[in-house]
């Protein structure tokens, strides 16, 4: 596992603060080409009044969103609907995944007030469904599991009718962490596999594919009422047969919901896009996934874990009842 230490001077007691690079571990990597995106991936720039209001509430509560940190292409659409995915435990991740635009380094201490701030923002936005994710916190004994649980509890207390979806890290080598999170009773537990196992060393070197599959399986064993969800990116050099095997692995873990989206390269220092997968291939993946038994599938070039999450959750409940 790669954990990056921040050795620059970020001491708030000094008058000058050294601005550290966002991805220090990638600084010496050779540049990779960034191809122009095809027409089916381009989106409108954000800027509506509702978008501005969402931004104001996020800023007032001093919160971090994965929408901004991960450079999500859907931020204009989602924030215009007052939908935001909150990223707890800071803006700095202890992992160094080759696809991700979130800052890498040694994070600061947890903000004990953050669960309440997230709950306040959820109430102000009037969310019927909220998605909460986090950076990886390998530096914490429980990987941040108790902080997840506290955030869920705070949202429940302030907005009891709001359904809660969490997108968790893998809690690798964090005994009891998953049990803590599941005991907090989120409605949906999402953990993304991100890519097929043959690409893990290059794309997700700090993670273990079958550990992630087992985490999803264990979550359902701990509480069968929870909906489980996972997502992957395509365009990283995977074969179709590998994606189909991944679907089988997730179904063997009784995962309910699969998302598949196009990988988009954040910078020249990140993993290159090996291929822009056309929309008809996403449609084929969706049909195959439904045939394999998933309750819900979202497979489009712009699909992301929390995109249309509220609408998808309502469909999930209806399909389980059917």
From Swiss-Prot:
Residues 1-36 are annotated as: Disordered. SMART domains: Elp3. Residues 14-34 have a biased composition (Basic and acidic residues). [4Fe-4S] cluster 1 binds at residues 67, 72, 78, 306. It is an enzyme of class 2 (transferase). One of its GO terms (cellular component) is cytoplasm. Its cofactor is [4Fe-4S] cluster. GO terms for molecular function: 4 iron, 4 sulfur cluster binding; lipoate synthase activity; metal ion binding. Residues 79-295 form the Radical SAM core domain. It is found in: Cytoplasm. Pfam families: Radical_SAM. Belongs to the radical SAM superfamily. Lipoyl synthase family. Binds 2 [4Fe-4S] clusters per subunit. One cluster is coordinated with 3 cysteines and an exchangeable S-adenosyl-L-methionine. It comes from the Bacteria. [4Fe-4S] cluster 2 binds at residues 93, 97, 100. Its EC number is 2.8.1.8. It catalyses: [[Fe-S] cluster scaffold protein carrying a second [4Fe-4S](2+) cluster] + N(6)-octanoyl-L-lysyl-[protein] + 2 oxidized [2Fe-2S]-[ferredoxin] + 2 S-adenosyl-L-methionine + 4 H(+) = [[Fe-S] cluster scaffold protein] + N(6)-[(R)-dihydrolipoyl]-L-lysyl-[protein] + 4 Fe(3+) + 2 hydrogen sulfide + 2 5'-deoxyadenosine + 2 L-methionine + 2 reduced [2Fe-2S]-[ferredoxin]. Keywords: 4Fe-4S, Cytoplasm, Iron, Iron-sulfur, Metal-binding, S-adenosyl-L-methionine, Transferase. InterPro entries: Aldolase_TIM (IPR013785), Elp3/MiaA/NifB-like_rSAM (IPR006638), Lipoyl_synth (IPR003698), rSAM (IPR007197). NCBIfam families: lipA, PRK05481.1, PRK12928.1. Pathway: Protein modification; protein lipoylation via endogenous pathway; protein N(6)-(lipoyl)lysine from octanoyl-[acyl-carrier-protein]: step 2/2. This is Lipoyl synthase 2.
